[in-house]
Amino acid sequence: MVYSRQKAGMSETGSSFSGAEPFTLAVDGMGGDGGPEVVVAGLAIAADRHPGARVLLIGDEATLRQELARHPKAAAICTIRPANSAIPMDMKPTAALRVRDSSMRLSMDAVAQGEAQGVVSAGNSGAMLALAKIVVKTLPGVSRPAMAAISPTLKGDVVMLDLGANVACDWRNLVEFAVMGEAFAKAVLGLPAPTIGLLNVGSEELKGDEKLRQAADVLRNSSLAAQFHGFVEGHDITAGTTDVVVTDGFTGNVALKTGEGALKMAFVLLRQVFRSGLLAKLGYLLVRPGLERMREWLDPRRYNGAVFVGLNGVVVKSHGGTDAEGFASAVDVAMDMVTHRFNESIREQLSRLDTLAAMRSGAEKEHPAVAAVS
C-alpha cells in the first residue's frame, strides 16, 4: 500500500493483539460491478500481503467456490458463508434494510456480532451506509458517521471527509469529523500530529457561513488547537496545505468528483499532445519514464477504499467499478485499520477533546444562536 502505518494495539472488540496475530475480515463477495470474480481475485492479491489474515467470504456459495478454485491463495485464507441474495447497485437504502439475508447484510452482522473486526464491500454505497448505521452502529460520542478517503497531494497524502455520507451538517458534525479525520491520519498515515483544515470559500476568519465559523471557534479552543490550521480553500487540498481536510458531504463529494474529472482530463490532453506530430512523439519517448511514474503515483487503484468512520467497527467501501488490484487496496485499508486500533484512536481523541459535551456547552454560551439550532 501507499500508506505508512503505525503499530497495532487493541482490536475492535477490545482484545489485545498485534498485527502478527490472526483477525477476521468479513467480505461481501457479491458487491460491485465485477462481482465475485473481482472480489476473489483481489483477495488473492491481498493474501500475499496479509498471510496471517482470515476472511469470512459471504455470498452465493457455488459461485464463490468456483472462483476460489481459480485462486488458491484466496482459498487459503477464506471461509465461505452462504447468502441467499445480493443488494443491487440501484436498490434504495430503505429497501436494502429489509433484505436480511443479503451478502452485504450478513457481512455487517458478522462485525456486529464480533465474528469479524471489519467489513469490505464494493456494493451499493447508500445501502452500505444505511446498514452500517443500523447494524454496526455508531461509536459513543459520534452523532453521524462520515465517509473518509485518502488522496495524493504535492506534499504526500491528505485525508478528506466527509465525502458524501452527510449532505447537510451542523458545526457539531464538522467538529466530530475533525476528530475522526485526525485519528484516521494518525492510524493510517502514521502522522504523529496531523494538521487540520476546514474547507471554506476563503482562508480569512470571517469567510464562510455560521456553522463553519462556529466549528472553527470550537477547534481553536480545544486540545486540537495546535494542529488546527484554520480555513483552507479548494486549491489547498492538492497543495497538501493540511493533512486533514474537513467539510460537509455535499461539498466533499463535489470536490472529490471534480478532482477525479480534472485528472482524467489532464491525461486525455497529454495523450492528444503527444500524438499531435512526429516531434511530439519523440518528446514522449524522452519523458515516458517520468510519465509512467506519475501515472503509477496517481493510479486511483492505489487509493481505493473509502472508510465510513465513526462506526463501532471498521467499514470500508471499495469503488464499485474497480479491478482486482483496486479491491486488494480496499482490503489493505481494512486490514491495516483493524490491526492499527483505528477505532480505539477515535475513542481516545473524543475523550481528549475536553469531551464534546463540554465543547458544545462552551460554544452555545459563546454563540447563543447555536442553542436554537441544536
UniProtKB/Swiss-Prot annotation:
GO terms for biological process: fatty acid biosynthetic process; phospholipid biosynthetic process. It is found in: Cytoplasm. Its main location: cytoplasm. GO terms for molecular function: phosphate:acyl-[acyl carrier protein] acyltransferase activity. The keyword Disulfide bond does not apply. It catalyses: a fatty acyl-[ACP] + phosphate = an acyl phosphate + holo-[ACP]. InterPro entries: FA_synthesis (IPR003664), Phospholipid_synth_PlsX-like (IPR012281). The keyword Calcium does not apply. Pathway: Lipid metabolism; phospholipid metabolism. Its EC number is 2.3.1.274. GO terms for cellular component: cytoplasm. Keywords: Cytoplasm, Lipid biosynthesis, Lipid metabolism, Phospholipid biosynthesis, Phospholipid metabolism, Transferase. PANTHER family: FATTY ACID/PHOSPHOLIPID SYNTHESIS PROTEIN PLSX, PHOSPHATE ACYLTRANSFERASE. Homodimer. Probably interacts with PlsY. Belongs to the PlsX family. Catalyzes the reversible formation of acyl-phosphate (acyl-PO(4)) from acyl-[acyl-carrier-protein] (acyl-ACP). This enzyme utilizes acyl-ACP as fatty acyl donor, but not acyl-CoA. This is Phosphate acyltransferase.
